[in-house]
């Protein structure tokens, strides 16, 4: 393990919906990579307990997806609070990346950051203010070089750790096929 300012923090949250004012976080995972996107460590993958009442408010898509992938059952069986998950995640990150240097990395990370600001503010504050959002490259590729999109397919399990791994692989794909850089 090596604390390095060039390391990148990848994060994904699964939530009961998209509005942080009325929805909650139900899963969090993190991965740390080096600047070349090589995975250095996987952080804790944590299902966060939410009440049956909270889970019952999920829309049909969320309920179907999170039931089929087993997350609803994990959330019901979990006793972990959002604060406890935040602290475990911070303990992991502090071993790899100093505070305030890594952008938040992933797909559509501004959505994750909205939930972090609301429910895990100390973790939200750990990131640099910049974002490394893979979905930006996807949007640009769809407009400037749409054929590139055909070469990368996601499984879309909507489990946090799987989603992060796919985001890292997707960025590596765009690095080579859209930006035309080879890994050093």
UniProtKB/Swiss-Prot annotation:
Residue ranges annotated as coiled coil are none
Which is one Pfam family of this protein?
Answer: RNase_T
Q: Where is it chiefly localized?
A: cytoplasm
Which GO CC annotations does the UniProt entry carry?
A: cytoplasm
Q: Which GO terms describe its molecular function?
A: 3'-5'-RNA exonuclease activity; nucleic acid binding
Q: What is its EC number?
A: 3.1.15.-
Asked if the keyword Hydrolase belongs to this entry, the reply reads yes
Keyword annotations for this protein, in alphabetical order, are: Cytoplasm, Exonuclease, Hydrolase, Nuclease
Question: Which intervals hold domain Exonuclease?
Answer: 8-171
UniProt subcellular location:
Cytoplasm
InterPro entries xrefs:
Exonuclease_RNaseT/DNA_pol3 (IPR013520), Oligoribonuclease (IPR022894), RNaseH-like_sf (IPR012337), RNaseH_sf (IPR036397)
Give the residues annotated as active site.
129
- Provide the family line: Belongs to the oligoribonuclease family.
Q: What is this protein called?
A: Oligoribonuclease
């Amino acid at each position: 393990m090596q604390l390095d300012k060039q390391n990148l923090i990848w994060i994904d949250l699964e939530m009961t919906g998209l509005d942080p004012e009325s929805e909650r976080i139900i899963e969090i995972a993190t991965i740390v990579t080096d600047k070349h996107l090589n995975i250095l460590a996987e952080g804790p993958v944590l299902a966060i307990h939410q009440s049956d009442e909270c889970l019952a408010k999920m829309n049909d898509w969320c309920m179907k997806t999170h039931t089929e992938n087993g997350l609803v059952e994990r959330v019901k069986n979990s006793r972990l609070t959002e604060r406890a998950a935040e602290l475990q995640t911070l303990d992991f990150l502090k071993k790899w990346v100093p505070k305030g240097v890594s952008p938040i990395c992933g797909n559509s990370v501004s959505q994750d950051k909205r939930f972090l600001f609301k429910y895990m503010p100390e973790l939200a504050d750990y990131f640099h203010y910049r974002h490394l959002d893979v979905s930006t490259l996807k949007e640009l590729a769809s407009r400037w070089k749409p054929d590139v999109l055909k070469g990368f397919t996601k499984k879309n399990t909507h489990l946090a750790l799987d989603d992060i791994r796919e985001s890292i692989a997707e960025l590596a794909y765009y690095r080579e096929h859209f930006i035309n850089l080879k890994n050093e």
